[in-house]
A protein has these predicted regions:
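Conserved N-terminal segment of class I S-adenosyl-L-methionine
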Residues: 1-119, 133-136, 189, 203-207
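Short catalytic micro-motifs in class I SAM-dependent methyltransferases
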Residues: 122-126
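A short glycine-rich, Lys/Arg-flanked "PGG" loop and its adjoining helix->strand segment in the class I
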Residues: 133-145
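Conserved beta-strand signature within the Rossmann-like core of class I S-adenosyl-L-methionine
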Residues: 146-154
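Short "lid" loop at the C-terminus of a central beta-strand within the Rossmann-like core
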Residues: 154-159, 193
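Acceptor-substrate binding/catalytic loop of class I
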Residues: 158-173
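Conserved S-adenosyl-L-methionine
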Residues: 183-195
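Core SAM-dependent methyltransferase catalytic element
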Residues: 194-214
Length: 214
């Protein structure tokens, strides 16, 4: 696996000093970040909206949907799931379909094969490798055979920007996750800028697009 140097002063993964993503304080932090700096003045989400829409993902299950930033850009009847009930409530207040894991399991229209695609954006870096594998194992059956899987993670500056990021997940790690889950990789790419920009631009992303076995 690729070796990413530890950030001085960052919390050690898995220790009590690592902030939680499950509480109301994390939801409030996400809401503040939505309105911070240049985001108040410019349509900074436009490139990322275009990137998702050009993939033509159909009905999407968005794992770790947060406040619905990506869910807003997904197809009709797409659904988000998040372990943070406060974030789920915010999504619903925005008119989005979102559930906690228990709520999703009980939803009549979210059974096996009911989604065209699975989106796992800015989630894998928040959890240990085994937990990430379990998430994929749990939710992949909800995607129809031949459907798409999109996994997105931050590059260097973005990784360092959040103390809840506990694990570096680059192209190599994404491919390993795909292989273990039986996902056929169609392509990987850096977005919105070429790979070297990840060392200076906080919103550069690793993207893997794959296919669920038929």
């Amino acid at each position: 696996m690729s070796d990413f140097p530890a950030t001085p002063g960052a919390p050690t993964p898995g220790t009590p000093s690592t902030p939680s993503t499950a509480g109301s304080d994390y939801t409030q932090r996400l809401a503040r970040l939505e309105q911070s700096g240049i985001k108040r003045l410019l349509p900074t989400q436009a490139p990322y909206r275009w990137n998702l829409q050009r993939l033509q993902l159909g009905r999407v299950l968005d794992i770790g949907c947060g406040l619905g930033r990506n869910l807003l850009n997904c197809g009709p009847d797409s659904v988000g799931v998040d372990h943070n009930p406060h974030s789920v409530q915010t999504c619903r207040e925005r008119g989005l379909n979102a559930y906690t894991p228990d709520g999703l399991a009980a939803a009549a229209d979210c059974g096996p094969g009911s989604f065209d695609s699975l989106l796992v954006a800015h989630v894998l870096e928040h959890v240990e490798e085994g937990t990430a594998a379990t998430l994929l194992e749990q939710y992949l059956p909800l995607v129809k055979p031949g459907g798409s899987v999109v996994m997105i993670t931050p590059q260097e500056v973005g990784f360092r920007s959040d103390a809840t990021h506990i694990r570096w997940v680059g192209f190599e790690e994404l491919r390993i996750h795909a292989a273990k889950a039986g996902i056929a990789v169609r392509r990987t790419y850096s977005f919105p800028f070429p790979r070297p920009m990840g060392k200076v631009f906080p919103y550069n992303e690793f993207v893997l697009v794959g296919t669920v076995p038929a």
